[in-house]
Amino acid sequence: NLDKILICPKIYLNSFQPAGEWPKAPELNEYYKIAKKIFSNSEIVSGMVTNFTELNRKRPKMFYDLVSFSFTPIVHDSSDFGVLNTPETIPYILKTLKNFSNSTKVHIGPISIGMHFNPYGESLVSNKNKIRLEMADSDPRHDQLFSLTWTLAIFIQSINKESKFFTFNSIYGHHGILNKDNTKRPLYHLNNFLISLTNSEIFKFNPVNEVYGLKIVLNDKKYYLFVNSSKQKKEIIIPELNISCLLYTSDAADESDR
């Protein structure tokens, strides 16, 4: 049996403007009802496969077991600065979602720098030259520590009472944690680390602007994890331990390759 199944009509892989013409299709709840009859032992995940913008425009009347949306930072701005600023939007997105979904549990994913779907055009932009590019099917920073920095910042910003599941990457391909030859990308280690946090207590701890942190309590031991999403070194203080730390930046490629 399937544990969970995400229901999203194919037509809604496209974007529709609030004041524009919408497709003549059954209400989303009709799809959910049918899915629940067929997959009676599975949790039904409502929402969109695309970004939160599309979910906000097409809000289901009922949300069932979970509500889902994906997240990518390169819709409008693919620069390092633009991408590293997107984690700031997550708390506002989740607050809005909580208000109109009656605090339904949340799944966020897929989460990646490169896009999985382009609801605003016929297809994704091919990025064979591996440059910074809006609406691209892949992104060169996925192979760098930059992707680890950004993904961890998204995870930390997403932690709240409603957020229950995250889908970060695939195994192989443009968004994979492994290369074709099975060598490990930086995100492989992040995924393994997050899996290791099962049964731990996690607390958000953001000591200064552009630094996101976690305090982790596991087996009566405390761990601190910080990510610097700025382009400068940052000094932070952990009052509980009475120590200061200097956080360096990721190894993002130079902007000249854009």
Where are the language model's segments positioned?
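Active-site beta->alpha loop and helix N-cap motifs at the rims of alpha/beta catalytic domains
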Residues: N1-W22
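Noncatalytic carbohydrate-binding groove/subsite architecture in carbohydrate-active enzymes
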Residues: P18-D143
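Aromatic/acidic polysaccharide-binding cleft in carbohydrate-active enzymes
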Residues: G109-L187
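Conserved small/polar residues in nucleotide/adenosyl-binding loops
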Residues: Y248-E255
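Glycan-recognition and catalytic regions of carbohydrate-active enzymes
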Residues: N160-K221
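Carbohydrate-binding surface patches
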Residues: P207-L241
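Non-cysteine beta-strand/loop elements that form the S-adenosyl-L-methionine
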Residues: I5-I7, L66-T72, F168
